[in-house]
């Protein structure tokens, strides 16, 4: 999925660059991987903050009623009151279940976004590491070749000419 997303972003790069200032800004974000990573991390933090604010700012009216009522007294003679209280309690439980379900869904979305950010981060670092490792191994390989060449020449310059064969 991430590979398809990267392919899509690469194919849209030219189109975005020619579509105006917003497209040019998006093309610039795509071309610089660390800035893209920082942008995704900022989106992750923003979405986390929005989930917390959504929960704090929007208390539902049944929940407020449940907070203001005191503990009910048990009267076996008053069955109608007990049924109403049971309905209120069931409504509160249903509300709690809905809130918990929304929070868990939001948490799952945040985890998925976080995983995508880390996948991109690992791909960026893997490319950097592989290029460093490739350059380092080339340098090491060159020095070995030179060492072997010099050792071969030094063997050929010894007194016995049979070592060169």
UniProtKB/Swiss-Prot annotation:
Say yes or no: keyword Membrane present: yes
Q: Where are the transmembrane segments?
A: 26-46
Membrane topology term:
Single-pass membrane protein
Tissue distribution is: Testis-specific.
What happens in the null mutant? Male mice are sterile. Spermatozoa show motility defects, lack the typical hooked sperm head appearance and fail to penetrate through the egg zona pellucida.
Question: Would you kindly state one Gene Ontology biological process term found in this protein's UniProt entry?
Answer: single fertilization
What the protein does?
A: Essential for male fertility, sperm head formation and sperm penetration through the egg zona pellucida.
PANTHER family the UniProt entry points to: TESTIS-EXPRESSED PROTEIN 46 (PTHR39412:SF1)
Q: Does the keyword Glycoprotein apply?
A: no
Compartments in which it is found: Membrane
Q: Which UniProt keywords apply?
A: Fertilization, Membrane, Signal, Transmembrane, Transmembrane helix
| Signal peptide stretch | 1-24
Question: Can you list the GO cellular component terms from the UniProt entry?
Answer: membrane
How is this protein named in the record? Testis expressed 46
Q: State the superkingdom.
A: Eukaryota
Q: Look up and give the organism this protein is from.
A: Mus musculus
**InterPro entries per UniProt:** TEX46-like
